[in-house]
Design a protein with these regions (language model features):
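Residues that define the transmembrane beta-barrel architecture of outer-membrane proteins
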Residues: 1, 23-28, 81-85, 92, ...
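Residues on the lipid-exposed face of transmembrane beta-strands in outer-membrane beta-barrel proteins
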Residues: 1, 29-34, 87-91, 144-148, ...
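Outer-membrane beta-barrel proteins
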Residues: 18-21, 43, 55-60, 107-113, ...
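Surface-exposed beta-loop-beta
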Residues: 117-214
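Extracellular loop and loop/strand-boundary signature of outer-membrane beta-barrel proteins
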Residues: 12-20, 71-75, 128-132, 174-178, ...
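Outer membrane beta-barrel
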Residues: 2-118, 151, 239-241
Length: 253
C-alpha cells in the first residue's frame, strides 16, 4: 500500500498499597497508523486505536486540551492522561493541518479513594458516575481542529462536541461521598503562540456551551528565557500568565 505504516503500544500500571483506587492498569497508546497517503495534492494520515493527543501552549492551565481524560490519581497537576480510543484522520496541505477525530468511547476521570491522598473532604465514588447522555460512556464524541502558522504566529482552532471531560461533583444521597456527573458540551477553542527571539507570547481561550449555560475562559501570558547563563549550559526561564473564567463562584464544582 502507498505510504508508511506504524504501530505503537505503551501500557501503564500503578500499584498502591494504601489506595485501591490508585492501583490501575491503562493503555496510554495502542494504535495503528497509515501515513504518507496522498489525494489531490493533500498528505493524509489515518490512525485507529488508543492514543494521547495534546493541545495547548500555556503552562498554568491547559484550557483547550480536551481529547484525553485526566488520570487524576497520578498527580494533581492534571498533566497525566488516560489513553483515548479514536479514529483520527489528518489532512495536510499548504493551507494548514486539519484533524478530524471520532471518539467512540468515553474514559471516566480517576479519583483517589478513601485512603488516597490528596483528595477532597468527601471521597469521589466514580464507580457510580452519572451522565446527561443516555448512551453514558458509549456516547460517540467528535472533534475538528485546524492548525497552521502565519509568520512567527502558531494558531490552533477547534470545535468539540461530546461528553465533558470535567465532571460536576454532586453530593450523593448518603451525604458521605461525591458522585461525578458528566454533561454534554459544545466547545470552541483557540490557542496562539507568537515567537520572537527569546520571547514566547501565549494565549488559550474557550467558549463552552453545556449545563444550561455558556461561558468563556482564557489564559494568557509570556515566557522569556535567558540562554547559557554566565557562559554555562544552564538556561533560566521567566513565566507569567493570567487566568480568567467568567463563571461565578456559586457554580457547581
Amino acid at each position: 500500500a502507498e505510504g508508511d505504516q506504524r504501530a505503537s503500544f505503551i501500557p501503564f500500571a500503578r500499584w498502591d498499597e494504601n489506595d485501591d483506587e490508585r492501583t490501575h492498569l491503562d493503555l496510554r497508546e495502542a494504535y495503528w497508523a497509515h501515513e504518507g497517503l496522498s489525494y489531490k495534492g493533500m498528505d493524509i494520515e489515518l490512525l485507529i486505536g488508543i492514543n494521547k493527543v495534546f493541545w495547548g501552549v500555556t503552562e498554568s492551565v491547559h484550557l483547550v486540551d480536551i481529547i484525553n481524560q485526566t488520570d487524576l490519581v497520578e498527580d494533581l497537576d492534571q498533566e497525566d492522561k488516560l489513553g483515548q480510543p479514536m479514529v483520527n484522520l489528518a489532512v495536510q496541505k499548504d493551507w494548514g493541518l486539519l484533524n478530524v477525530y471520532i471518539l467512540p468511547y468515553f474514559r471516566e476521570r480517576t479519583f483517589p479513594g478513601v485512603d488516597g491522598r490528596f483528595r477532597a473532604p468527601l471521597p469521589v465514588n466514580w464507580d457510580d458516575a452519572e451522565y446527561e447522555s443516555g448512551d453514558k460512556d458509549k456516547h460517540v464524541d467528535f472533534a475538528l481542529r485546524y492548525s497552521h502558522y502565519f509568520g512567527d504566529v502558531d494558531v490552533g482552532l477547534y470545535y468539540f462536541r461530546g461528553t465533558n471531560r470535567e465532571p460536576r461533583l454532586e453530593v450523593a444521597p448518603n451525604g458521605r461521598e461525591l458522585t461525578p456527573f458528566y454533561d454534554q458540551v459544545d466547545q470552541v477553542g483557540l490557542d496562539l503562540q507568537y515567537t520572537k527571539d527569546a520571547w514566547l507570547w501565549k494565549l488559550e481561550a474557550i467558549v463552552r456551551d453545556g449545563y444550561d449555560e455558556s461561558f468563556m475562559a482564557s489564559v494568557a501570558g509570556f515566557e522569556y528565557t535567558f540562554y547559557q547563563v554566565y557562559e554555562s549550559d544552564a538556561d533560566i526561564g521567566f513565566l507569567m500568565e493570567y487566568q480568567y473564567d467568567e463563571r461565578s463562584s456559586r457554580e457547581p464544582a
